[in-house]
Structure formats: structure tokens, C-alpha cells
Amino acid sequence: MAISNKQKAAIAAIVLVGGVATGGVLLSGRSAPEEQGGHSESKGHGDTEHHGKQAAEADHKDDKSHGDGEHHEVKKGPNGGALFSRDGYDVEIGTAESKGEARIRLWVSKSGKAVANGVAATGQLVRATGESQALKFVVSGDALESQQPVAEPHVFDVTANVTLPGSSSPLAVRLSKEEGKIELTADQLAKTGVVVQTAGSAKVQAGVQFPGEIRFNEDKTAHVVPRLAGVVESVPANIGQQVKKGQVLAVIASTGLSDQRSELLAAQKRLDLARVTYDREKKLWEQKISADEDYLSARNALQEAQISVQNAQQKLTAIGASNSSTALNRYELRAPFAGMIVEKHISLGEAVADNANVFTLSDLSSVWAEFVVSAKDVERVRIGEKASINSASSDVKADGTVSYVGSLLGEQTRTAKARVTLTNPQMAWRPGLFVTVDVFGADVEVPVAVKTEAVQDVNGESVVFVAVQGGFVPQPVKVGRTNGKVIEIVEGLKPGARYAAANSFVLKAELGKSSAEHGH
């Protein structure tokens, strides 16, 4: 049957419309699965690994698997760690307490069931200070746990390579922590006055520190005794009084002194008589009137009388009594040297013995800082070495030298006594005051040292605040020798690390506030 031109045109229109509709159906059918499945990563994610980041953790880059430049957020696992997935396995990395210490832990699961056997992992922890720590993982229960504990502060990045069962290549997982970081802007840093310096080598004196106590200088301390028994008539001196040499401390009525003065007076009278007799006999002997025997006898008597007077005088001098007095029994007890009366055991009307300790007098212009040296430190403390004395209850400081080190160790304590002699013109060092004695040796070059004021005590641990991007991190350190200005860092800090050298106490206060707010 012949088809007219109108019929041909109608058929062509129908075919065209049907083709367009079919193409639309095909196009819509191709895009629907992609919309339902999210995004295809057959080329960009050949390993089907899922990457991302938690809001509190640092960004990570995965250029190889993210060939399209996409960025994904890390999923949070059921244990609060970062969750990664591949080949049906879920790997969560985080921290957990074990045996009282924090450790890095890996939780591996497949289809919701924990998998530990057949999984191996190694890793590396890098701190904000640049220090790195290799990590080895062992199976612990239904997870893998680092053999090495992780010390505070928990500000670090961890990368671990996890080998899964049946996998040809390890899965890289990452964890970032910023617990305890003190965040400060440049303006805040300027307002707080915190000064940042670089840790490096310095010269410090090899020294050792001892607890000590200020004591009387025993070379200038005396127990004053009367040396004659008697009754106290007056006591013009008082405890705490500064006295001069020869000043009267007490007056005692002594019968013994009366006898000695009487003996002197009698000896002087006998001497006068012997001198007159000798002069007369000498003249007669010169005139050939007196015999030689009489002259020699008179001269001998004179010499004996002189000896008796000298003996009586020296007895009085030995007890500190004057040769003459208005009262023969009056004994004036005088200060043997200038000093302060620190003890007094005498009162008016009291009968005292000749050996009674009635006063203790000490010249406090010089005192001793005594300390005890253990057997292991005896070789480090030598006579003549420089020492620094610091009061435990005030800001008083003084420098001196070691004046004595005991040559014998105590039988029970196994320690030796040592002391530093200090001048005390202002009487700032009082006997009984507890002090700290730092004994210094020769200068020693140490690889890492910081300012002494940079070291803060946080929960009984020495800490230096290290400058990191955006703030500071409290870094535990082990300190060594110090000269009072700089202190050696034995562990915990590397040369070149930037730290808070001045006003670090501000950071300590901020750390305390943060701990109180977060309960950490």
C-alpha cells in the first residue's frame, strides 16, 4: 500500500519522540545507582579504604588513595578512637589505660566480631618536640596493644601499619592527640609576658645539693664559767645582749677569792720586809761589817718573797680576778670576747659552783652552715670548693667555701659532717635556721640546658613548657646540674627546642585551669 507524504511525516515524528524518551530512560537508569551508592572509588580508592578525620584531630593527607583530591572525615569508633576500613575489616586506633599506664591500642573487627589473631602492626609516635618513639604491638585480649607506654603530655601523632589477614599490603592508620595543649595566640603571648628561648648547650658547675642547718661558729662560742664558787650578788647582763670584751656579766661573792687576795697581800708584805732586810744586809756587807752568810741569806729571802708575790698574782690572773678590790671577796665575771649572750643560767642570790655554765657567749658575726654528706657523695665535696647557701624560709642567700669535711664516716649513719663558714654582719643567718647547701665543682659543658625559672613543678614532676604550633605543651623532663641561673636537662628535651624561659608560671596556671575544667 502506498504511503502518502503526510503519513511519512507522522511516522518520523513518532520515531523521534520515542528515541528521545528511550535515551532519557537510559540516562536516568545509569545515574540512579550512583546517587544511591554515594560515590564510586573504583579508580581513586582501589583498596576500598575509607579515610577521614575527627573534629578534634589534625588533618591528614592521602594523596595516593585520594586521587581526586577529595577530603573525608575520620569516623569515630566505639572506643572513642579513629576508625579506618578496608576489605571488610574495621581498624580503630586510640589510647587506653593498661597496668596504670596509657598505651596505644588497635581494635580490629570484621562483620562486628573482634579479630586479633593473624593481625600484626608496627608504628611510630612523634611528639610536638620532635622526639619520636618506635611502637611494637602485641595481642592483648581482643585487641593489639603497644608494648611501650605513652608518657604525658598526650600531644602527639601516631602512624601505625596494620597487616590484616589475607592482605598483601598493610593498612596505614593515624591518630593525633592534643590533650594538655595550652593554646595561645600571638597577642595573648605578648600580654602574658612569656618569653620564648631555644634550649641548647651551656656551661654549668658540677654540683650536689644537701639539706643543712645554721649553727654557732664553735671557734667563736664559749661557755662562761665563774671558776670560783660563790653567791651571786648582781647580774647586769641579759640573754640576747651584745657585750664587749671585758664587760662585767655578773658579780659573785667568793670566799675562795678572798683567801687568794689575802695570800697576795701577805706575800706583798713579806716582800717589803725582805727588800728592807736585803738592803740593810747589802750595805753592811759592802762595809765589811756583815758576814757573807747574812748577806746571802737576805738575798735569798728577797727572791723567795718575790716568787710568792708572783705566784699569788698569777693565781688571780688565771681566774680573771683583779689584784685589788674594795672587797676581797668581790669577783667580777667578765666577757672573754665580744659577742652575744645566747644562754643564761644565773640569777641573783643563787649559789654557783666553780664549774657551772652560767653564760653561753657567741660571736655571731660568723656562723657555720653544717650539712651531712653521704658516702657516695664524699668524693664530690672537698675543702675549698665553692658553695651557695639558700634559706629554706626566706630569700636570704650567701656564697662561701667548704671549710671542713669530716675524714671519718659515722658508724651508724655512714655519713660525714661538712660545713661552710659564713660571714654574718647583718645577723641574717640565725642558728637553727634550715638551709639548702649547693656545693659546686668545676664548670662542665652540658648539651641541653634551660633557664632555671623555666622548670616548673606540676604534680610533683619537673616540667618545661615547649612552644608548638598554636601554643605550648607541658613537657616532663629530668633535670641535672645547675648553677642557679641555668639547669641541665638530662632527659625530655632536645637541643634547639623552643621553650618558655620567663613567666612560665602563667602557663602552669593555665594548665591548672584546663585540668580543672576537663577533669584531666
UniProtKB/Swiss-Prot annotation:
Region of interest (Disordered), residue spans: 28-85
Keywords linked to the UniProt accession: Cadmium resistance, Cobalt, Plasmid, Transport, Zinc
InterPro entries (alphabetical): Co/Zn/Cd_resistance_CzcB-like, CusB-like_dom_1, CusB_D23, MFP_Cation_Efflux, RND_pump_MFP
Cellular component GO terms held in the UniProt record: membrane; outer membrane-bounded periplasmic space
Gene Ontology molecular functions: metal ion transmembrane transporter activity; transition metal ion binding
A Gene Ontology biological process term: response to cadmium ion
Biased composition (Basic and acidic residues): 32-76
Lyase among keywords: no
Gene3D superfamilies (UniProt xref): 2.40.30.170, 2.40.420.20, 2.40.50.100, Helix hairpin bin (1.10.287.470)
Coiled-coil residues: none
Source organism superkingdom: Bacteria
Free-text function comment from the UniProt entry: CzcA and CzcB together would act in zinc efflux nearly as effectively as the complete czc efflux system (CzcABC). The CzcB protein is thought to funnel zinc cations to the CzcA transport protein.
Homology family: Belongs to the membrane fusion protein (MFP) (TC 8.A.1) family.
Name the UniProt record assigns to this protein: Cation efflux system protein CzcB
Lineage: Bacteria, Pseudomonadati, Pseudomonadota, Betaproteobacteria, Burkholderiales
